[in-house]
Amino acid sequence: SPSRGLGDVYKRQIAQAIQNKYAQVQKESIPFMESKKETIRHLEADSLSAAVQSNYILRYSSFPVHENTTAEYFQVGDDMFPVLVRELEQAQHYIYIEYFIINDGVMWRTILDILERKASEGVDVRLIYDGFGCLTTLPYHYDRFLKEKGIQCRIFNPFRPLLNIVQNNRDHRKICVIDGHTGFTGGINLADEYINQKKRFGHWKDTAVMLKGEAVWNMTVMFLHMWNVINNSSEPIDHEIHMPHRFHQEPFAGNGFVQPYSDTPLDGEIVGENVYLNIINRARKYVYICTPYLIIDNEMMTALCLAAKSGVDVRIMTPGIPDKKMVFLLTQSYYEQLLEAGVRIYEYQPGFLPVS
């Protein structure tokens, strides 16, 4: 219909405008996002296949690989939360937070108290939340409430019913950066079910990781890119003041390689899926996957089945108690083909498994 055609054109125009702005801020960061030659040499000596993977990520997401970074893994949000609180309390210069879902409760109130206090002490506190992810969890104009507390706030793609043709463009990232040298990411949103203070669909099993060191730079830049895109700001990012060593003069520890990266659906390159396909295709011993929604395309199905048929131990874990029954039925519809290929599938009986 003519109205649908106009809607499609408008949707493409909006998407292109966002992509153009994102490309602009990415271009400004290029001089500050180059991999260290020494790090690349170390990675190539350690694993040539990992170096090839790393080079692809750099070329198509613009985020380099780093050394001198420690990573602490948290099996559940219950373990991550007290560490996050501890690190927020130690912030002296800036706290940048970007989450899909924020919901009032024990977790958010605890964090908000710290953010308000830190802002009053002169710490630069900024928050991005998704307009749809927080549609039913935060009051309308919550950004104004936060501004009164000294917290700068931006909403990614605020929900507008009359413009629903662009409402599928969402910010699912979960990022917290503290003073440029400490970062949290993973699947955990800022809501009580993620720390099992609120029961929804049984035990809530999600994971997170804390990075300390040079790789946090990638997460800082991710946030600053999004901040400028939402602001539609032409003011360039002050990269120098956000460098990891700016507020951490001592050398960082860490023996491995860390490469945080982001992906966007607007540029035509499916970096995230390609990285997973590379990992699966190069697996020699095992592939273990956790996912709340097993909805895979032909390429992913072929890769998983071929790995299992080749003798790789392929295991997939899905929720025992789903949050969306129709989506779970779709998830289960993929079981037969995977099982026939030798993939082992488990359902997490204690509850929901949003970890990916």
Report each predicted region and the residues it spans.
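Active-site proximal loops enriched in glycine and acidic residues that flank catalytic Cys/His/Asp
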Residues: 99, 262, 291-293, 318-321, ...
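N-terminal localization/anchoring segments of enzymes in phospholipid and broader phosphate metabolism
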Residues: 1-274, 278, 282, 306, ...
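Glycine-rich phosphate/pyrophosphate-binding beta-alpha loops
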Residues: 190-193, 292, 331
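Short beta->alpha linker loops
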Residues: 79, 106, 295, 349-352
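Helical hairpin unit composed of two closely spaced alpha helices linked by a short loop
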Residues: 293-315, 319, 324
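C-terminal structural cap/anchor segments
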Residues: 324-356
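A general structural signal for well-ordered alpha-helical packing
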Residues: 273, 280, 301, 314, ...
